[in-house]
Amino acid sequence: MNAMRRIDYAARKDAINAQKRAAYAARKNFSVYSSLNMEPKPVTMQSISNIKSFNCETLDGAKQQQLQSAHKRLLMTAAKQPPGVEVGKAFDLNMKPLTQDVVGSAEGHSVKLPNFNVPYAVIHTHPACGVFSPGDLLSFVDNESLKLMIAIGHNGHIFAVEKSSEYNSNEANGIVWQLSAEIDRLKNIPRAELPDEQLLEQTEKLVWQAIRELQKNGVKFYE
């Protein structure tokens, strides 16, 4: 409490490989949209109190409670960072940490977490409290072992995506590849015709559309 107070794969192989190459090339572009709403919010005691547990397929009830506690601790770490800087952490599915708290750079803001070969979950903060970025979705579908991803807003609101037993990797990769291509198209429109604010608004709409499509292909979405 004191701490809180301180605050047919072969047939599609070429297409899949092309999608992966395109997704890899898009990583740098995606980082620009790590926060779709660019105004960071402060972390408050109310924010931390707002964090709730949620039922998911990947973790049992006890581990869901551990996850809730991890979210609160991470948000307290985020409160100590410069405005807009993300913080993240990775866990195995027994909720044993695979990393320490990882802090994004003051310049780039976005946090970069390593990939693992064991099934795992990642949690990270979203200072502006927005939904997943295109880069988040890319990381989620690109890493087979990543089963659960959570974004914690500085207001305590949580977004989560989970690979269920019905997850279709090929379709999911295709959905995110299409998202990447559409965002690239928008980025190529001169800013005089599509100002940054409108670009971010359209990007967010595309992300929500992609999430709806992912839900049809075995991705569970929680908020």
Describe every region a protein language model picked out.
Residues 145-223:
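Divalent-metal-activated hydrolytic enzyme cores
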Residues 32-118, 189-220:
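Glycine-rich short-loop/terminal segments
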Residues 1-34:
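BZIP DNA-binding basic region
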Residues 4, 19, 66-69, 73, ...:
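Exposed alpha-helical structural elements
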Residues 7, 133-139, 165-172:
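General structural signal for secondary-structure boundaries
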